[in-house]
Swiss-Prot record:
Record keywords, A-Z: Kinase, Transferase
Name of the gene encoding the protein in the UniProt record: acbM
Pfam family, one: ROK
GO molecular function: kinase activity
Family: Belongs to the ROK (NagC/XylR) family.
Biological role stated in the UniProt entry: Catalyzes the conversion of 2-epi-5-epi-valiolone to 2-epi-5-epi-valiolone 7-phosphate. Involved in the biosynthesis of the acarviose moiety of the alpha-glucosidase inhibitor acarbose.
Gene3D superfamilies listed in its UniProt record: 3.30.420.40
Cited InterPro entries: ATPase_NBD, ROK
Record bears the keyword Kinase: yes
Stated name of the protein: 2-epi-5-epi-valiolone 7-kinase
Lineage: Bacteria, Bacillati, Actinomycetota, Actinomycetes, Micromonosporales
Length: 359
């Protein structure tokens, strides 16, 4: 029997830099994707968290048709049983204060059936659909962008385990050490703490590491590819990418330094769980610097791999790790999948499995 077509879902993806929204259905896919700057801390650093949260709710509420179903992918550390957002340094600054996002959306637009999931969770839901028939036991999606986080799913059960706080994979706030010429580089994370993975390996973190290295060795950096391009008017990201394309040694050393914490995390993950058949890297940093990004990560793992395994099976580690195209793990599609799965009540609750919040 042919299944009836689904009505389109309004989907939104709230990142630290951009807010995207569109209409989506399993039958028709994504419609036209609209983009606007996120109403967040990066754009309005002087605004309080409550004001930024209220602005976000107004923005989302204005994008949904009356009586519609909406799926929201949110770049925040969330309790996935309740939908409460604990914190998002890129969106709301270093403040950590619980914010009941579904309740705020329902209050603003009670006619809409809202489903809210973390943005990495949303991307992983889409990725899981894309690789479900590829024999993958467990898949981990790692996003490297304005922030850094990951999620892991067991595709055999569909479960995304969470801890007692409803969290999983907030790796951007794990401690990390970055070395340049053997000397530690200490930078501060957007959450306010020094020495986190995101403090050096996120988009803003890479810029901070570059600034520290330029102060340490101004003569070398003055004539480097990134500096000369920025002096000619390019932004840091474009200048860094172009310098990597040209084989600039300063840019290459910077990339080596800032990918080391990511490689350390992935090495540990595969040591602890060999059933991770796919670790997919995504996000603006990974996509913007590819193919240099995956090459740098793989180089770390070839030089310092897994004890014995990397000697006996040299490709086992690197063969599981790759940068995937944006269309393979799109949080907009994942938000739509979550909205359809939620139905009138959440599809998952309790039992250590992540909730798809629609209450």
């Amino acid at each position: 029997m042919k299944r009836p077509p689904h009505h389109p879902v309004t989907v939104a993806d709230v990142g630290g830099t951009h807010l995207r929204w569109a209409r989506w259905s399993p039958d028709g896919g994504l419609g036209e994707v609209h983009t606007t700057p996120s109403p967040g801390h990066a754009r309005r650093p002087g605004a309080g968290a409550a004001d930024l949260q209220a602005e976000l709710i107004r923005e989302l509420a204005s994008r949904v048709e009356p009586g519609a179903r909406a799926g929201v992918s949110l770049g925040a550390a969330m309790d996935h049983h309740s939908g409460t957002a604990y914190a998002s340094a890129p969106l709301w600054g270093p403040q950590v204060s619980p914010f009941d996002v579904p309740a705020a959306l329902r209050a603003a637009r009670p006619d809409v059936h809202w489903t809210v999931v973390n943005d990495v969770t949303a991307g992983l839901l889409h990725l899981a659909e894309m690789v479900r028939d590829a024999g993958v036991r467990k898949a981990c999606l790692v996003t490297i962008s304005t922030g850094i986080a990951c999620r892991t799913m067991d595709l055999r059960t569909g479960g995304i385990p969470v801890d007692a706080a409803g969290l999983q994979g907030e790796i951007g706030h794990l401690p990390a050490t970055v070395l340049a010429d053997g000397v530690p580089v200490v930078t501060r994370c957007d959450c306010g703490e020094p020495g986190h993975v995101a403090a050096s390996s996120s988009g803003p973190g890479i810029r901070r590491v570059a600034a520290v290295l330029a102060r340490r060795d101004p003569a070398t950096w003055a004539g480097s590819g990134p500096t000369t391009r920025m002096m000619a008017g390019s932004g840091f990201e474009d200048a860094f990418r172009a310098a990597l394309d040209d084989g600039d040694p300063v840019a290459a050393d910077l990339l080596t330094a800032v990918t080391a914490p990511i490689a350390d995390l992935l090495r540990t993950a595969l040591c602890l769980d060999p059933e991770l058949d796919l670790i997919a890297l995504t996000g603006g940093v990974a996509h913007g610097l590819e193919p240099h990004y995956s090459a740098a990560v793989h180089d770390h793992l070839r030089r310092r791999g897994l004890y014995l395994t990397s000697e006996r099976e040299p490709d086992w580690l690197t063969g599981r790790i790759r940068v995937v195209p944006p269309a393979t793990a799109d949080p907009l599609v994942g938000a739509g999948l979550a909205a359809l799965a939620a139905g009138p009540v959440p599809a998952y609750s309790g039992g250590g499995r992540e909730a798809l919040v629609g209450r």
